[in-house]
């Protein structure tokens, strides 16, 4: 049996989807263990509020209109705020989980989970415990670029430079079909499904390496 909290847990919410924001507010308020102190549609709105009104716990969507949940985590850590972040996301990629954990998330809950999972994650984090899904430690230490061949690294750099498949084929001396074949292998190794996601991952890793 879960011991009662001495006082209500103060929670803020930030998500780009108004339906999610309203649903989370209703879920938390009806439970009785929580109070909702702020609801925000963007990362900047949340960060501006935290500068003047610190909050104990924030439930943060990963994909925000102006930044990612990872950016929020980085800013909170940089400012040394005592706010504890729970990432609540529909993103299922291992890279998102890896980034969230390495950036200091206290909790990570998929939007496909039952509501009770999120509520118990909030309680655990409020009590000073991490609430993270099981993850192999090798995953956290794994650099997804390490498994790429020289050709795949070359292709990733070309994608980051905005090259089309035709330009890549012309400049590397391989056929367009061969380019497509290498790109499919590249996406599989990176755990992404398209070039936009591959470029975003490439930029994120390079940015982290130069911090």
From Swiss-Prot:
GO BP term (any one): phosphorelay signal transduction system
Residues modified as 4-aspartylphosphate: 15
Annotated coiled-coil segments of the chain: none
Alphabetical list of SMART domains matching this protein: HTH_LUXR, REC
Alphabetized SUPFAM superfamilies for the sequence: C-terminal effector domain of the bipartite response regulators (SSF46894), CheY-like (SSF52172)
Gene3D superfamilies the UniProt entry points to: 3.40.50.2300, Winged helix-like DNA-binding domain superfamily/Winged helix DNA-binding domain
Positions of the Response regulatory domain: 10-126
Domain HTH luxR-type: 141-206
Family matches, as InterPro entries: CheY-like_superfamily, Sig_transdc_resp-reg_C-effctor, Sig_transdc_resp-reg_receiver, Tscrpt_reg_LuxR_C, WalR-like, WH-like_DNA-bd_sf
Pfam families: GerE, Response_reg
Sorted UniProt keywords: DNA-binding, Phosphoprotein, Transcription, Transcription regulation
Highest taxon of the lineage: Bacteria
Record-level Gene Ontology MF annotations: DNA binding
Function per UniProt: Not known. Could act on the sgaA gene expression.
Protein name: Probable transcriptional regulatory protein SgaR
Source species of the chain: Hyphomicrobium methylovorum
Lineage of the organism: Bacteria, Pseudomonadati, Pseudomonadota, Alphaproteobacteria, Hyphomicrobiales
């Amino acid at each position: 049996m879960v011991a009662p909290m001495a006082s209500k847990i103060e929670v803020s919410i930030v998500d780009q989807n108004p339906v999610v924001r309203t649903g989370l507010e209703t879920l938390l308020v009806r439970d009785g263990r929580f109070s909702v102190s702020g609801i925000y549609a963007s990362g900047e709105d949340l960060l501006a509020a935290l500068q003047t009104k610190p909050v104990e716990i924030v439930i943060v969507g990963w994909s925000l209109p102006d930044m990612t949940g990872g950016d929020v985590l980085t800013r909170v850590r940089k400012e040394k705020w005592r706010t504890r972040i729970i990432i609540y996301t529909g993103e299922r990629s291992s890279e998102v989980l890896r980034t969230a954990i390495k950036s200091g998330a206290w909790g990570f809950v998929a939007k496909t989970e039952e509501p009770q999972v999120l509520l118990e994650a909030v309680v655990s984090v409020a009590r000073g415990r991490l609430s993270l899904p099981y993850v192999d430690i090798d995953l956290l230490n794994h650099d997804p670029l390490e498994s790429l061949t020289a050709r795949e690294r070359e292709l990733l750099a070309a994608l980051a430079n905005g090259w089309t498949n035709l330009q890549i084929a012309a400049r590397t001396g391989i056929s367009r079909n061969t380019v497509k074949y290498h790109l499919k292998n590249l996406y599989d190794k990176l755990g992404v499904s398209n070039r936009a996601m591959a470029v975003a991952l490439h930029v994120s890793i390079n940015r982290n390496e130069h911090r």
